[in-house]
Amino acid sequence: MKLREWNAHLHGLVVFRALLNDPVVAKLLDLTDRMEAGCSSYGPVCDAVAAFEAALFEYTTNWGSYLSNAVLEAETICVRQAAAGQLDALLQSALDSELQFLQQLCGLTLDELFQTAYSEQAQRPELAFLPRWQTCELDLAAAYAQRMSEVGKKGYGMFAKHHVFTVENGQLVPVKYPDPQRLSELPGYEKEREKVIANTKALLAGMPANNVLLYGDAGTGKSSAVKAIANEFAPEGLRLVEVKKNQLYQIPDLMDKLAANPLKFILFIDDLSFTANDDNFAALKAILEGSVGGRAQNIAVYATSNRRHLIKETLSDRTGDDIHEADTRQKLMSLSARFGLTVTFQRPEKARFETILEELAKQHNIQMPTEQLLLKAEAFALRAGGRSPRVAKQFIEQCEAGVQK
């Protein structure tokens, strides 16, 4: 393929148009543009090669590996249509053509690029010092077909690269370094978590799944359970979207955006509570009741709360003049009943606390006699305000750091 063809095919990408915004591919396009322009000086070309390689080497030295991963993870109209079960014939033809070109591009070397731009007589030793990136051979069309068949688990676009997201200005933003909590690292409360896990498995299987409320005492592992479940089932196609309380009104729009996505989503609201006149109360109630649009089958709302009834009562709430005050309070407190599944996390009694401690001590390889460990932990818990898994973990971390001896 001649330089002009490489350059034209890059500029002419349709299905994979978004690749031109990729930081590495964009540098390659700039390089071929400069070479195609026929720069009389080698300076601009050397600069473009160096810029391309610097961008590539931030990730890998293998250009073929980088480009193939970018292709497989790209969000395109083809992958969206295929996920919905129908791919237009014209788009299929365009997809096949571009995959054929991109496979060739995966094998492009610097020497080959120079040979297409300059005759052997015209090449100069000034270019010899430039490093040579690696390439790889692969059947990109077959790899892409395989990826399309697994899109319900691996996703596309940012959902292929990340599994935890937050919401900023109505848009999903990937969390690059999510909490790495694993279920195996959470001793105790197995029965409570199993209910949430079973509901999550139903969601992943495309079966009816409940919205879930995890409520109970602070520090009992409610939030950790949700995050660990998200980590555990990410390879199965689960994604977690953390929604703040003041963003609840955005949930209907988020559901609309995610409804056609082949992945499954948990909209996670942590530490949920309201005052009686909170506008967010009405928003969440409408969402849970399904009165704001229909609930998508690939989405469930999981919330944690330290209060069973979610509503923070004040003295004025209890002594107001409203003749319907009792009915109002009843309506407010009934919000918790709108969750299909509620799971209680209670502060552990002494025996349960000690079991959690011993398991955490094993995980962290704490070398301390059991009797001494339990006595010190009990004293630590008293100073910390009571027993809880969080307190147990804090104590073990202090032992690991040498603070507790």
Regions found by a protein language model. Name each.
Residues 211-241, 254-259:
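Walker A/P-loop
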Residues 193-197, 234-265, 276-282:
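Short glycine-rich substrate-engagement loop in P-loop NTPases that contacts/grips substrate
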Residues 321-333, 340-354:
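Conserved AAA+ ATPase "SRH/arginine-finger" region at the nucleotide-binding site
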Residues 346-405:
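C-terminal alpha-helical "lid" subdomain
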Residues 1-187:
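AAA+ P-loop ATPase mechanoenzymes
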Residues 178-211:
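Pre-Walker A (pre-P-loop) alpha-helix and adjacent loop at the N terminus of AAA/AAA+ ATPase modules
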Residues 259-260, 275-321, 327:
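Conserved catalytic/switch belt of AAA+ P-loop NTPases
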Residues 270-272:
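Walker B catalytic acidic pair
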